């Protein structure tokens, strides 16, 4: 997918870029696969902010995505490639021969009319989903499960991909987008190919208002807050933070401080840590 630039008619337009949406084939989603999506604005059930900088934004409907890819042995044909406001990747509507319709993440180079399949007997081609044990070493994959049957949890963002490096007993070695090498159960499924819409990372927002359309609120620096609101707050004028190292709003060290738990259960599955 290409990047569309704009004439500098205003300061906001001068640096703005968007997708050209050349791959999108329809602007009407499948109604049976839509669900209501209410605004949370970063609040929990008590009304307290648990995630900052969220709120507002355009109204959305949730698209029900098939991350499990468990419709084994039944071929499906790609009907449309669609935009999904809830994720960076595009989605593809699949019409199966038994009449069912499902959305999947649209891999790179997937086109309308192509046939896809799920299951251990599926061919190694773009869009097909198989157990990792059936995928050859060196294959590029996405939408990887961590537990069999739970549905894909890893490598789902636009342009991301992982690679199968080897097989060890009941585990398969997978190199993730971050560079981390991880053991995944061989019964877990993955989809062949790279996630599409790889130019998503090149988009420039251009103006503050466009971030608000996306539901993102401003990020205020701690140094301009009051002491009651942030460890960096207070002082006369532009004061130093008065700490040995920068702190989060909750008084924890930040900017380089490791936050991963020391004895996390999944550590034994990580063969090589991600790149710094």
Curated annotation (Swiss-Prot):
Swiss-Prot/TrEMBL GO biological process terms: cytoplasmic translation
Sequence segments annotated as region (Disordered): 1-20, 219-276
GO CC terms of this entry: large ribosomal subunit
A Pfam family: Ribosomal_L2_C
Subunit-structure text: Part of the 50S ribosomal subunit. Forms a bridge to the 30S subunit in the 70S ribosome.
Family: Belongs to the universal ribosomal protein uL2 family.
HAMAP family: Ribosomal_uL2_B
Protein name: Large ribosomal subunit protein uL2
Organism: Bacillus anthracis
């Amino acid at each position: 997918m290409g990047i569309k630039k704009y004439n500098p008619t205003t300061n906001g337009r001068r640096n703005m870029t968007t997708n050209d949406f050349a791959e999108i084939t329809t602007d009407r989603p499948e109604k049976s696969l839509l669900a209501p999506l209410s605004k949370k604005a970063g609040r929990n059930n008590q009304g307290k902010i648990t995630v900052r900088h969220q709120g507002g934004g355009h109204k959305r409907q949730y698209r029900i995505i098939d991350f499990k890819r468990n419709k084994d042995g039944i071929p499906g044909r790609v009907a449309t490639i669609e935009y999904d406001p809830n994720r960076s990747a595009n989605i593809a509507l699949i019409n199966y021969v038994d009449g069912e319709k499902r959305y999947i993440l649209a891999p790179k180079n997937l086109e309308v009319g192509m046939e896809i399949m799920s299951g251990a007997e599926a061919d190694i081609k773009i869009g097909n989903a198989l157990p990792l044990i059936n995928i050859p070493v060196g294959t590029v994959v996405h939408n990887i499960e961590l537990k069999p049957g739970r549905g894909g949890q890893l490598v789902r963002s636009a342009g991301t991909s992982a690679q199968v490096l080897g097989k060890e007993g009941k585990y398969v070695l997978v190199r993730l987008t971050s560079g981390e090498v991880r053991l995944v159960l061989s019964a877990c499924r993955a989809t062949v190919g790279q996630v599409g819409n790889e130019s998503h990372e090149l988009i420039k927002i251009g103006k503050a208002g466009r971030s608000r359309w996306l539901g993102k609120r401003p990020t205020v620096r701690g140094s301009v807050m009051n002491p009651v609101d942030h460890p960096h707050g207070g002082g006369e004028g532009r004061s130093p933070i008065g700490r040995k190292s920068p702190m989060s709003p909750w008084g924890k060290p930040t900017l380089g401080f490791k936050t991963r738990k020391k004895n996390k259960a999944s550590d034994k599955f990580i063969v090589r840590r991600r790149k710094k």
